[in-house]
Amino acid sequence: MGPRARTVCFLFFLLWVLAELAENSDFHLPGDYLLGGLFTLHANMKGIVHLNFLQVPMCKEYEMKVSGYNLMQAMRFAVEEINNDSSLLPDVLLGYEMVDVCYISNNVQPALYFLAQEDNLLPIQEDYSNYVPRVVAVIGPENSESVMTVAHFLSLFLLPQITYSAISDQLQDKQRFPALLRTTPSAKHHIEAMVQLMLHFHWNWISVLVSSDTYGRDNGQMLGDRLAGGDICIAFQETLPTLQSNQDIMPEDHQRLVSIVEKLQQSTARVVVVFSPDLSLYNFFREVLRQNFTGAVWIASESWAIDPVLHNLTGLHRTGTFLGITIQNVPIPGFSEFRVRGPQAGPTNQRSTCNQECDTCLNSTLSFNTVLRLSGERIVYSVYSAVYAVAHALHSLLGCDHSTCTKRVVYPWQLVQEIWKVNFTLLDHQIFFDPQGDVALHLEIVQWQWDLSQNPFQSIASYNPLQGRLKHIQDISWHTINNTIPVSMCSKRCQSGQKKKPVGIHTCCFECIDCLPGTFLNQTEDEYDCQACPSNEWSHQSETSCFKRRLSFLEWHEAATIAVALLAALGFLXXXXXXXXXXXXXXXPMVRSAGGPMCFLMLTLLLVAYMVVPVYVGPPKVTTCLCRQALFPVCFTICISCITMRSFQIVCVFKMASRFPRAYSYWVRYQGSYVSVAFITALKVVTVVISLLATGLNPTTRADTDDPKIMIISCNPNYRNSLLFNTSLDLLLSVVGFSFAYMGKELPTNYNEAKFITFSMTFYFTSSVSLCTFMSVYDGVLVTIVDLLVTVFNLLAISLGYFGPKCYMILFYPERNTPAYFNSMIQGYTMRRD
């Protein structure tokens, strides 16, 4: 005997022991094809019956559940409606066998009863392909733990099972449960609807309470996994003790409830998510009322989201706002009247089983009928659609047309294949099973109301599992002062432009710190760090974006620019006048003593240098930068080198020619002055080229250290570092020129240029050193204007300081610009030396 046969044999033994006879037409209806129904009419939360107990629990000994009877009535209503429908299963009568499963206590015996044949025998066979059990399909039960227990039995025979409210994602495993389907969205959609609700109201600090059974543990774990690393944090999670509302509470369980409620009181989290069966919550909420815990937002899982008995608990409305996640309401015409209709008169002669009695069900339902009627048909529709799914599958399997069906034996494996294929419209809703065996019904967020004139479970929003978001969110009557939305945050939301500094282990607990100037907060990328603005942008403190810095450069309308331009124009005119005066007296001794042709070279370069001044104004370009960094320095260096060589040549004539006649003759013969100027010019060109290669010509920008909102655009990004290198040759020439001028202070008056050269060279040396010092300590917007001003002053020092006195002598003392006068001055100098 194989393992499968031994298993079936054992089940047969249990079935033979557990079977008994009871008659009640409320639970049984004969028909051509029977449906099995498993409902919780009474609930036993603690008394779990194990397989080694050979007595079936008597469900009527436990507390009655109105909602369970309401669902059983939905199945009866659907079967009766189908039997009266001439278009669906014409000429075929559906029957049913329904059993009370006591929540989780009575699952095995009904499963065996449904699997057995009419004689209560379950034969041992090698092949069950042609086996016909008592029922063709089973509707229920309601909770995931019971569904899995029953499914393990039914799946051995591929007997179709459709659950109407079990949401565990474990039920999607078709390797374990190939014949199991459900007409309710899976747990992940319920969890996601909760999360979207909390995100909508900015609740990021919550408490979670779970029951100690599989339902509570699994859903609590799923919620924790969904929230891990997200925007919502769990302040704490506690496990509720398993309690029966009509049983005396044990001291340890009571102390546990007291501790949990005290923890809720002390927590700053005002939103409480509860995953638990309804019967486990009665004593808990009694303790909540006893401790006067108010102002909370209770988010109910689908297991108690629309429970009428818990809703009727006295004073419950004082504890806060109740929001529940449940299946959408689909009104079923005629069901409200059918729900309170009594059982059919007279016993039946058909064989039934135990736990098919509920003496108080109808009266209890009548007492809650108003609440049930106003709350609408939610899970009721899931039962209703499950029955219709089986009916449509049978309709297809029996080859029915509009008037007749071919009645024949229906095997479970055939029917389950047809159920997977069904696709029909029921009360304007499309019913079909996805690859996981679920029907994608919408979910609703309901608010509990205690005004008898309103729906006790008022819909405030809907959730589409296919879209994954809430919609049609309505106003909520908050149980708070001034009807304000409750706040449940570990930390208040940061203001715009503030970064989060984590506090503790929860991501929802943080300090808010302002972003510093020059940084901004990009919340889409990183809420915990301020990002630096790009180099050409800036921001104030606590900003979420940067703005463009204002580019700073010399402009013509500025007063400083106009003043410097006027000085440059004055220098240009003076240099042009000096060139005209020198050209008019080109053969005169005064011009020849000033350098002759070299004098015209200097004046020409000075004019060019003055013409370069305007390129300092306006935004720098490659061409203007080339003029600033190459053309002007070369021109100025040639001018200084000419002055230096002129000083050296005069000293040579009067003091060194007699001592070194041969050297002097070589100097004169090979034009030593021009060769020296050419060499110095070449050296300057090399210096400029090296500087340009090191720094480049492209204009660059830098932030103003005094005003970060300003971006200074300049030619040389390392101007301060290269300034001393670029001017080193000029400074050396100025020192040498000053030295030669000082050596010639005793020369004839017409050749004594010590005062003028000393003035020019000293001014240049002092201004250049001052500029280097200034730029080493300051890097603001004044650098360019100071640089230009020093440049113009240096040009003026040469133009006016060196050429000015000579022009003055040519214009106002022409008698001194004669060869005779110069010869007399030389003779006087010679006589003094002798």
UniProtKB/Swiss-Prot annotation:
InterPro entries hit by this protein: ANF_lig-bd_rcpt (IPR001828), GPCR_3 (IPR000337), GPCR_3_9-Cys_dom (IPR011500), GPCR_3_9-Cys_sf (IPR038550), GPCR_3_C (IPR017978), GPCR_3_Ca_sens_rcpt-rel (IPR000068), GPCR_3_CS (IPR017979), Peripla_BP_I (IPR028082)
Cross-referenced Gene3D superfamilies: 3.40.50.2300, GPCR, family 3, nine cysteines domain
Localization, UniProt: Cell membrane
A Pfam family the protein falls into: NCD3G
Residues the record marks as carrying a glycan: N84, N292, N312, N363, N423, N482, N522
Coiled-coil region: none
Chain ranges on the Extracellular side, renumbered to this chain: 20-561, 619-630, 698-722, 777-779
Listed GO CC annotations: plasma membrane; sweet taste receptor complex
The UniProt record lists the keyword Glycoprotein: yes
Transmembrane segments: 562-582, 598-618, 631-651, 677-697, 723-743, 756-776, 780-800
UniProt KW keywords: Cell membrane, G-protein coupled receptor, Glycoprotein, Membrane, Receptor, Sensory transduction, Signal, Taste, Transducer, Transmembrane, Transmembrane helix
Superkingdom of the organism of origin: Eukaryota
One function term, GO molecular function aspect: G protein-coupled receptor activity
Membrane topology, as annotated: Multi-pass membrane protein
Residues exposed to the Cytoplasmic side: 583-597, 652-676, 744-755, 801-834
Extent of the signal sequence: 1-19
Family, similarity comment: Belongs to the G-protein coupled receptor 3 family. TAS1R subfamily.
Binding partners and assembly: Forms heterodimers with TAS1R3.
Function: Putative taste receptor. TAS1R2/TAS1R3 recognizes diverse natural and synthetic sweeteners.
The protein's name: Taste receptor type 1 member 2
Originating gene: TAS1R2
